[in-house]
């Protein structure tokens, strides 16, 4: 079974993962989100500099976690697009350098394909075969904030004095010949993140686009509404926390393209109108704080409910029309518990199965890119040309460059 190294640097998260087939051997993630927080959004130059700082240490940590050396790697997968070109360039350059120096084939893969297939990775959180070790920000002198995922197993954590990072030490790895192949089932995939909101169809190992956002992505809407409310970046977790104590039925916000739409927009999304409607309510409260009805918690809950309603209703409708029995959800917005809950409830009514990756795999990470590379290698795709370049826009029809 081939062992694939995955590198992810499409936005503000740096990820290095290692998989063998569908088995996660390592997954190291660092985020520069704390550096962007004062600006209320991602600053491309800051993100790119953070990737340069994080990537060497994460590569070292991933190999150590997997108990491998670079010569054990059979293929390198790296996000080639879509994303911020300055950020993508860091990962692509690193992958090319590794590939050239070791003679290992390099696959420049589509970021969205990584999200789509991440749900088909084994449940490494329960079987001791892998790890998500997430560092929300790494400063030049060490860790600013460590948000590692929890595990049912007890393992040791030690400090690497050279990199000044925490290193997860797992149990001894299984041999590559007992790992399973990536088995990607026919399904409808909902991808929702800060940069993308789209519905995909996987059929016979091919991915096609059913619909996408016509304006703002769902995650982008969360960030913008959070900014209007005076909440911290990133907005998704902040709004979800606020919404937990609010009434989701307090305000009837619009659900664009949900009941009245043209046929070609049946599976498309639009969140700009919802964003405007929420903004008006927030501004009304700010202008008259003595009469703050509805409460800010109710606004957050009602906004979240509207987003969940649109995303899940269209996804279930697409699955029923596509004659598949499986729905997959990925992307950072898939970490929202209310959206996950509503999708599972609606799918169950129609007898549909739902696969959602562990929350740590919903956000950008290297394991999902390694998984995409593993899948594409299984399907017989050729490595990318040595001169390939990262691109900000990459159609789904182009799974590898």
Curated annotation (Swiss-Prot):
Pfam families for this protein: TsaD
UniProt GO MF annotations: iron ion binding; N(6)-L-threonylcarbamoyladenine synthase activity
Residues the entry annotates as binding substrate: 191-195, 223, 236, 336
One GO CC annotation: cytoplasm
Substrates-to-products reaction catalysed: L-threonylcarbamoyladenylate + adenosine(37) in tRNA = N(6)-L-threonylcarbamoyladenosine(37) in tRNA + AMP + H(+)
EC identifiers of the protein: 2.3.1.234
Primary location: cytoplasm
Positions of Fe cation binding: 111, 115, 364
Keywords: Acyltransferase, Cytoplasm, Iron, Metal-binding, Transferase, tRNA processing
Cofactor binding remark: Binds 1 Fe(2+) ion per subunit.
GO BP of this protein: tRNA threonylcarbamoyladenosine modification
Needed co-factor(s): Fe(2+)
Enzyme type, top EC level: transferase
Subcellular location: Cytoplasm
Superkingdom in the source lineage: Bacteria
Family affiliation: Belongs to the KAE1 / TsaD family.
PANTHER family the record matches: TRNA N6-ADENOSINE THREONYLCARBAMOYLTRANSFERASE (PTHR11735), TRNA N6-ADENOSINE THREONYLCARBAMOYLTRANSFERASE, MITOCHONDRIAL (PTHR11735:SF6)
Job of this protein: Required for the formation of a threonylcarbamoyl group on adenosine at position 37 (t(6)A37) in tRNAs that read codons beginning with adenine. Is involved in the transfer of the threonylcarbamoyl moiety of threonylcarbamoyl-AMP (TC-AMP) to the N6 group of A37, together with TsaE and TsaB. TsaD likely plays a direct catalytic role in this reaction.
Name of protein: tRNA N6-adenosine threonylcarbamoyltransferase
Annotated organism of origin: Tropheryma whipplei (strain Twist)
Lineage per the UniProt record: Bacteria, Bacillati, Actinomycetota, Actinomycetes, Micrococcales
């Amino acid at each position: 079974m081939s062992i694939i190294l995955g590198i992810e640097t499409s936005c503000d998260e740096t990820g290095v993962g290692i998989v063998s087939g569908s088995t996660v051997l390592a997954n190291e993630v660092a985020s520069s989100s704390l550096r962007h927080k004062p600006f209320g959004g991602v600053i491309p130059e800051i993100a790119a500099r953070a990737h340069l700082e994080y990537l060497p240490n994460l590569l070292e940590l991933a190999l150590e976690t997997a108990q491998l050396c670079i010569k054990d790697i059979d293929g390198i997968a790296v996000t080639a697009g879509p994303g911020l070109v300055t950020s993508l360039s860091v990962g692509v350059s690193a992958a090319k350098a590794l590939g050239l120096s070791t003679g290992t084939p390099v696959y420049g893969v589509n970021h969205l394909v990584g999200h789509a297939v991440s749900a088909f990775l084994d449940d490494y959180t329960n079987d001791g075969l892998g790890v998500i070790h997430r560092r929300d920000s790494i400063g030049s002198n060490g860790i600013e904030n460590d948000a590692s995922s929890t595990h049912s197993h007890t393992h040791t954590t030690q400090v690497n004095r050279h990199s000044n990072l925490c290193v997860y030490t797992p149990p001894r790895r299984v041999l590559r010949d007992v790992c399973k192949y990536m088995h990607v089932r026919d399904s409808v995939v909902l991808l929702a993140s800060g940069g993308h909101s789209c519905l995909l169809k996987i059929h016979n190992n091919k991915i096609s686009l059913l619909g996408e956002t016509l304006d703002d992505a769902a995650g982008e809407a969360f960030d913008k509404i959070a900014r209007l409310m005076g909440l911290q970046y990133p907005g998704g977790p902040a709004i979800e926390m606020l919404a937990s104590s609010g009434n989701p039925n307090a305000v009837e916000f619009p659900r664009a393209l949900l009941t009245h739409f043209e046929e070609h927009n049946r599976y498309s999304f639009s969140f700009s109108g919802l964003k405007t409607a929420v903004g008006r309510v927030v501004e009304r409260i700010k202008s008259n704080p003595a009469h703050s009805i509805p409460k800010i918690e109710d606004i957050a809950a009602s906004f979240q409910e509207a987003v969940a309603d649109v995303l899940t209703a269209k996804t279930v409708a697409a699955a029923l029309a596509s004659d598949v029995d499986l729905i997959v959800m990925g992307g950072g917005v898939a970490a929202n518990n209310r959206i996950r809950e509503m999708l599972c409830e609606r799918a169950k009514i129609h007898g549909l199965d739902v696969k959602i990756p562990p929350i740590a795999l919903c956000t950008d990470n290297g394991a999902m890119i390694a998984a995409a590379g593993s899948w594409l290698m299984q399907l017989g795709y050729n490595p990318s040309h040595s001169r390939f370049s990262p691109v900000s826009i990459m159609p789904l029809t182009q799974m590898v460059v």
